[in-house]
Amino acid sequence: MADLSFIEDAVAFPEKEEDEEEEEEEGVEWGYEEGVEWGLVFPDANGEYQSPINLNSREARYDPSLLDVRLSPNYVVCRDCEVTNDGHTIQVILKSKSVLSGGPLPQGQEFELYEVRFHWGRENQRGSEHTVNFKAFPMELHLIHWNSTLFGSIDEAVGKPHGIAIIALFVQIGKEHVGLKAVTEILQDIQYKGKSKTIPCFNPNTLLPDPLLRDYWVYEGSLTIPPCSEGVTWILFRYPLTISQMQIEEFRRLRTHVKGAELVEGCDGILGDNFRPTQPLSDRVIRAAFQ
C-alpha cells in the first residue's frame, strides 16, 4: 500500500484516459509557499466542500444522535512503525490493524487507521490547519482512516463518499507528551526529505485526549493536501493534546529538501508552516456531540 505520499503517488494523480497525461502530472510538485494555487493543478482543490475550516463553536449544532452509538477507536499498539519525512510533513505509518467505528460514521462500517500526520507552525501562534473561533494552535495531528468495509485500500477510498475519516487533534504547549516521545526522539535522524526510521513501538491510544470520546465536532470536507479530494468525515476533538516546547522544536529543525540539495533563492529549507489556509464553510453544518 502506498504511503500517504500516496498523495504524491497513486492517489494524487488518479487514472487518466491518456497515459501521457498521467506521466506528465506525476512529476508535479506542490508546497505551502505563499500564493501557490493548488487548484490550478489539482481540480478537486476548487471544490465547494474543502478543508480545513474555521470552526465557530457558537454556530455548531448539537446532535444527540452522535451519541447513540459511541465513537469507538479500537486501536492497538503498533510494532515497527515507519516514521518518514516526506518534505511536507512527518508521517507515522501504522502496520497494526487499528479501526474506528461509531459516532458519525456509517453504522456497521469500520475505518482502518492508516497513518498519523503532523502540521505545525514556525512559531507557537500558528500551525494548526483548522481554527476554533479564529484561534490557531501551534500544531494539529491528523489520524487518517479509510473505510475498510467498503474498499480494499486507501487508494480506492480516497474521493469516494464515506471513504475517509480523519480525527483532528489540536496541540498546545505545556508538559511533555510521553506518547509522542517515540517520534520526537528520532526526528534528528530523519531531518531531511526522504529519510525514514523504524520505531519499535507506537501507541495511537495515547493521542486520544478524552476517555469518554464525547466532546467533538463533526463536518464533511476534504483532504487538506493535494489532491484535496472530498468525501472526508472530519472529527475534531474539543480538548487539545499537550506537548513540550522542546518537543515542538524538534519538528522545527526538519527540512523540506534532501541533504545537500541546492535551495532556490528565498527558501531556507525549513519544514514548518505546513498548513493550508481555512476554506469557506459554504452551506455545511458543523455538528457537536456535546452541549
Curated annotation (Swiss-Prot):
GO cellular component: cytoplasm
Keyword Cell membrane: no
Residues carrying Phosphoserine: 5
UniProt feature, compositional bias: Acidic residues: 16-28
Record: residues binding Zn(2+): 119, 142
Family: Belongs to the alpha-carbonic anhydrase family.
Role according to the record: Does not have a carbonic anhydrase catalytic activity.
Protein name per its UniProtKB record: Carbonic anhydrase-related protein
